[in-house]
Amino acid sequence: MGNSYAGQLKTTRFEEVLHNSIEASLRSNNLVPRPIFSQLYLEAEQQLAALEGGSRVDNEEEEEEGEGGLETNGPPNPFQLHPLPEGCCTTDGFCQAGKDLRLVSISNEPMDVPAGFLLVGVKSPSLPDHLLVCAVDKRFLPDDNGHNALLGFSGNCVGCGKKGFCYFTEFSNHINLKLTTQPKKQKHLKYYLVRNAQGTLTKGPLICWKGSEFRSRQIPASTCSSSLFPALESTAAFPSEPVPGTNPSILMGAQQAGPASDHPSLNAAMGPAVFNGKDSPKCQQLAKNNLLALPRPSALGILSNSGPPKKRHKGWSPESPSAPDGGCPQGGGNRAKYESAGMSCVPQVGLVGPASVTFPVVASGEPVSVPDNLLKICKAKPVIFKGHGNFPYLCGNLNDVVVSPLLYTCYQNSQSVSRAYEQYGASAIQPISEEMQLLLTVYYLVQLAADQVPLMEDLEQIFLRSWRESHLTEIRQYQQAPPQPFPPAPSAAAPVTSAQLPWLASLAASSCNDSVHVIECAYSLAEGLSEMFRLLVEGKLAKTNYVVIICACRSAAIDSCIAVTGKYQARILSESLLTPAEYQKEVNYELVTGKVDSLGAFFSTLCPEGDIDILLDKFHQENQGHISSSLAASSVTKAASLDVSGTPVCTSYNLEPHSIRPFQLAVAQKLLSHVCSIADSSTQNLDLGSFEKVDFLICIPPSEVTYQQTLLHVWHSGVLLELGLKKEHMTKQRVEQYVLKLDTEAQTKFKAFLQNSFQNPHTLFVLIHDHAHWDLVSSTVHNLYSQSDPSVGLVDRLLNCREVKEAPNIVTLHVTSFPYALQTQHTLISPYNEIHWPASCSNGVDLYHENKKYFGLSEFIESTLSGHSLPLLRYDSSFEAMVTALGKRFPRLHSAVIRTFVLVQHYAAALMAVSGLPQMKNYTSVETLEITQNLLNSPKQCPCGHGLMVLLRVPCSPLAVVAYERLAHVRARLALEEHFEIILGSPSSGVTVGKHFVKQLRMWQKIEDVEWRPQTYLELEGLPCILIFSGMDPHGESLPRSLRYCDLRLINSSCLVRTALEQELGLAAYFVSNEVPLEKGARNEALESDAEKLSSTDNEDEELGTEGSTSEKRSPMKRERSRSHDSASSSLSSKASGSALGGESSAQPTALPQGEHARSPQPRGPAEEGRAPGEKQRPRASQGPPSAISRHSPGPTPQPDCSLRTGQRSVQVSVTSSCSQLSSSSGSSSSSVAPAAGTWVLQASQCSLTKACRQPPIVFLPKLVYDMVVSTDSSGLPKAASLLPSPSVMWASSFRPLLSKTMTSTEQSLYYRQWTVPRPSHMDYGNRAEGRVDGFHPRRLLLSGPPQIGKTGAYLQFLSVLSRMLVRLTEVDVYDEEEININLREESDWHYLQLSDPWPDLELFKKLPFDYIIHDPKYEDASLICSHYQGIKSEDRGMSRKPEDLYVRRQTARMRLSKYAAYNTYHHCEQCHQYMGFHPRYQLYESTLHAFAFSYSMLGEEIQLHFIIPKSKEHHFVFSQPGGQLESMRLPLVTDKSHEYIKSPTFTPTTGRHEHGLFNLYHAMDGASHLHVLVVKEYEMAIYKKYWPNHIMLVLPSIFNSAGVGAAHFLIKELSYHNLELERNRQEELGIKPQDIWPFIVISDDSCVMWNVVDVNSAGERSREFSWSERNVSLKHIMQHIEAAPDIMHYALLGLRKWSSKTRASEVQEPFSRCHVHNFIILNVDLTQNVQYNQNRFLCDDVDFNLRVHSAGLLLCRFNRFSVMKKQIVVGGHRSFHITSKVSDNSAAVVPAQYICAPDSKHTFLAAPAQLLLEKFLQHHSHLFFPLSLKNHDHPVLSVDCYLNLGSQISVCYVSSRPHSLNISCSDLLFSGLLLYLCDSFVGASFLKKFHFLKGATLCVICQDRSSLRQTVVRLELEDEWQFRLRDEFQTANAREDRPLFFLTGRHI
């Protein structure tokens, strides 16, 4: 029979496979059993079994539930109403009794609503605009997720008061709904009704019936704000069970999955509610929250309901999340916290973790009574986790039990894990079944050690891996194949049936020695819970830690729950459900009510001499007047090395100077780089160019020590001086303006900061949020709690206020060591704006050399696990044993109280033992004794009395006060007040130190101020002290280098989140000297310890007779580590532990192993185990507890290598025998510790600070935390890193990968950004609702780095470099060079003597001689131009520069940009946005391309130019009508007088400077209208147009792409003249004379940045005595002044002096000079019509043009009192031309000597224009052509019609061949050479014969080709006087197609 039908298991195979599976999983380190159950089914019937057994869909999933359960799936029948009673009212909106039920009518009337009922709005088809009011039993209404409504109905009529309607049909008749279909409560009960602040009944949230259409509605804030807070205070608790979905960004519906945008936003002022059964407006107002109305998706989709009729009042689907029940509040059900102020979208994950608030769970069925005195009997409150299905009511002694829904939430999340594969179309992949979930949970609990607590993260990963493995084939199939339109048939989703589950679970639990007990129920969970309570009361579960209750009676589903009954686990779990506020409240209550008195009384019974206080008093009386002999030698008075003055000297005490370390500088530069990248982005979110200076505000947590510490950092960093504050103004009050303590007074100071930022738009304000993870509570929570705690949500209210977010000049920098809570899916900080502290090395190479090495958490763990040294992380086994024992004795006391009292007792006993009461050694632990001995003896090792600091961390402030008072009392009784200080460190108060110690500190730190007091912990350097550090969280306080012990045994070990753990351990972070390796130092410490201590430990092992001692003896390193860390020899033998254990009747054997196993310093990983001989190294499981922990479980299955494990103890030891063994060893232990005391402490006679520099502090941890920290996963990542990152966030999904040790900080950030979401109380919770797609704030950055590593110094350095950069942005490097050749200036009798003339007098100016000498320093290496006035000596010329130094060595000065500066493309400001074409209100300016052609005879062809004209600039041009062809550029009239525009068009030729060219003349022109044209090459047109979209551009023809600046100048001038002619013709038609058209243009370099004017104060008109000053003015001012000159039309060329700080008075004394002009010229194109620029030139074309203009008899005038500043631009310009070889593989540099070659040679040709090669060659090697001219300034080279630079050693004489030209008299000059460059027909033989040459002078003729060369020689009859040789012909090194230039040289006969 049994195996004959489909789906039945094969019994024999089943038992065999299951047995092997369970045994293998128990032996394995892997927590996740292989999914073997799929093997157990007959494959042929797999699908059918799956559909029948595993794919359960409750009938209740269907919404169409009918009256009486008679409905079928067919179409609904028309509903017939029962006949109405005669005489009753039938009016719509009234009941049959005639009472008005309409909401609008009775909204203000009082209503009698029984307990458990809610007022509901009924929708009537006949009254669509009205709601009818009725009262309904809320058990028949759905919970917030649309589930758990009992079938049926129970309601009352609020009109007539009739009660007891049991059928909705009957009720709908009574209220006259008049329906044509069968009444359904889901259809007609539509809204909850709530009362607003005025007490008026109003429509509230939609009732979320499952499957109904979901609508996002919100109650107006005014509706609920008034009564929300009182309800929270009294009864409401926020449920932590969210919608059962994994990803909050996806709204899962029963029939659809909507996008994230459909997610309803949580109303900030509205919270979910829990009812206590009383109907009050306050409760009703909180009735429902729309966010919870998310429909629950079916695991298998919507299936047809073919099941049997439904039974009335049957519960909803067990998949439904439970809603709080009003009738039976569970224990702790009233707890609420900030995290719960809004509804969680995603469940809590940690069974252990903060914010795991306990909430009532919905119940069904018969109630279960909780026995009285359960806590007294069990010694701990059992914690019951709801699992699957329905959970019964609890009643009776509810205070002794805790119920939590967290496990249910975990189950629900893992049920939906397959949704991640929906993108592959994998609807066939089923979630893990409920049966498998429960079985895996049992497996997990079985493998937990006795001292382990279950973690939800572990369980989630087990489910995930099991699911992955069981569906690996399907997953791969869908990942590799495209989505299929029709998915295959479902595979088996539940290989284990509910009927088999209890037996399988019992079988799995059978091997764990009853640690896990399984109870099977026949009917309901109530039966199993009652059974569990009975067993607990009878003491039959004394050895049981977990009870699994399973009810599999229902055909398609299971009910389950898990109760934690182990005393250790239950205590930790129940305490972890308390919020921090509740935790403090609980401790306060126990202290205030005197509950702890029993604990104190117990301690007083331990001492054999009686109460410790009596012993202290006795000791005090005996030793009054003198100090104990053991401490008589004061550390200060002992013999020591003295300095000259007789003061003791200590070489180890040197306070480190405040200096910036390489790491900090690197981080500061990274921060600066990120700020610059924000500014450089196209989003225009930060305009660095508009800021002139930096200001800042540092916001810190409300800690006085942190506040003072930050003030000191700011003071010593010098940042305020860097920001411009004068040294004399540096006062403490001034520094305090920059640091804001976020307390109740912060708002005023912050408002002043905002006001300051608003008033100073040109100041960049950096808002630094230090310790940014501290307060992340949303300001909406403040709205709820503002009356009770005004500081709630303060950070959000200040730093996230609208003013900060919108201010364009505020950058917010969050700084934290624990950034995880700021890295969620809703974060405001872009991942690109995160800056992580850099790693110290890469690939083994130090990136930044530092003399100190940072020692943080990872280094602590690494050193502890490595085994190379004494462990720095330790736990105190005897302390933990004592706490565990006392926890059982005092179950009603919080463990924090017990731990604090035990630790204080240990410290007191240790102090007494060290002070001369050796018998007290038995009442402390070795760890505490070590701390105390080193604390008291360290001052003896130093001549100055320097000692060490002991940090005692007591998070709970009231307990810290208790500890302080007790230790101070003991210290006073022992007369140790001057030996060490006890400091109570509290965030709210500063540092208080006794006068004696203040005096010592002043002496050590050489402080003369008698009023000085230490205000930070850093100032306690070297002070022997115990710092009792209180506060729930550290607030960024730094600790001194003298910190030697970090005692964290009292931290809240139940609060297992990553931030909390790392924050506490961060207190020990340290910088150690890089000079001494840590391991070496640690080994030295091991050598200092005494051998007797080690032997006593081994002897102890032999005494206890364990096999582990043999392996421990074999491994010296392990013995050493055991000695360093364990307290077995003394603490386990202490009478305190003995009596605590002995007096505990129900003490479990696990108490002993808990203390005994701790003899090993930590659970050993495989690397450590492998070091013991004979041990086999096994890989650590990637998930789950470390092997040492699993070894501690009671009665483990025997394993082969059990005997070889270090520290293994026999678990089966009776309490009596253990006590007797411990007692018997007390004598030997006390004697063994006594001699050890002298050698345990610091041995060498050296200051403790010497050792402190070499080694980090030793950290003592609670055992639970220790195990969490040192256990690692397969990648080596500490398990603590995988915990929930912060209490204010939640995991977004169970379906998430694990963190890996190989992840960088950036990868971890991306991980948290993907897998965490903020809780509703988190300030980022509502970020995605702001409508922005990305949600990132553009000016917000995050700096993260390990604690105590120097982040404060880094961001202060960042402020400094940012300030420097802003100053640098407002500064430019301008050329600052003295004019050259001043001593060669023409010394003529003629000077321009009218010093005060604003414009030159034409007649006077004409008489001035032209100064041929070039004075512009950029031409320092140019050939000197000679005239007959000069007598030049060779020494008058300075040393020429090397060619490569020409640019590098030019002198510059840094100048602050004025408001009249020209800018490049990086400048942005509001004023010139429109000018630039980037204004946000405008689109990029449209431009049109216009061709403009004109003929030029010299070029022999028509020139066609192109104008790019933006639409906004078309008014400057004339276009033909109607064709729109460009005709001309408009020119003003000479007679126009306007101060609003500049008449002269400005042309700026440019190349290679599209970003850096100074083309933004808006500010330079002071906003005046002007015409500015950029002249660009064709190939650069697009890039210039991109950067300057609103500028007119003149595009040169493509033939000029490789031309030099001469071509641009040539075309500008010719175009301008041609345009002048066109305008004259056009305006002549309008009656305007041609001479009235303005003929001037400006040709400006693209590097002109600012313009200046010289103000001269002279004593008289002709006096040479005067004073002058120079100031910056606008270009508009200069241009309008020059354009207003009366005789300006007579000048051909005007220019300005080049600015120099070295300008002499003589240079500005004369206002005008007739000389060369450069850089910025004003050209009269009319007068210079016949003078052209040379279009071929690259260099010196302006000098050449100046000489041409002068020789044509035209006037050049330089305004000496105007100057132009030229910016140094390192890109573009003439540097754009690179001379390279045409042979691509020739990488050798080309030198100028290679620029020419012999014709027809095999020379390598160059890729450069021939003209450039010519000019460059002549500049560097012209002496080869003119050897006689070298340094021969009396005999220059004659240069005809051109000026070419022949180098600084050769002088030239320029003459023009044009008729009537002005030339110098050359009759008395003998020339050393003749240069004929492309001579035209004006040069003839007769012209050359006028000049005389030295014998041997050389000639150089340059022509376009060889034939022209010969023709020129013949035409000029050169062979008459010059000798030519064939070898004297050359060409530029160009290929033939590049048209080389040809040279011919000759020698004068």
UniProtKB/Swiss-Prot annotation:
One of its GO terms (cellular component) is membrane. It is found in: Membrane. One of its GO terms (biological process) is morphogenesis of an epithelium. Expressed in proliferating prostatic tissue and prostate cancer. Residues 1085-1095, 1110-1126, 1166-1178 have a biased composition (Basic and acidic residues). InterPro entries: GREB1, GREB1-like_2nd, GREB1-like_C, GREB1-like_cpSF2, GREB1_N, TAGT. Keywords: Membrane, Transmembrane, Transmembrane helix. The chain crosses the membrane at residues 1868-1888. It is a single-pass membrane protein. Residues 1127-1147 have a biased composition (Low complexity). Residues 52-77, 302-334, 1085-1210 are annotated as: Disordered. Residues 59-68 have a biased composition (Acidic residues). Induction: Estrogen-responsive; regulated by estrogen receptors. Regulated by androgens. The regulatory region of the gene contains 3 estrogen-responsive elements. Belongs to the GREB1 family. May play a role in estrogen-stimulated cell proliferation. Acts as a regulator of hormone-dependent cancer growth in breast and prostate cancers. PANTHER family: GREB1-RELATED, PROTEIN GREB1. This is Protein GREB1.
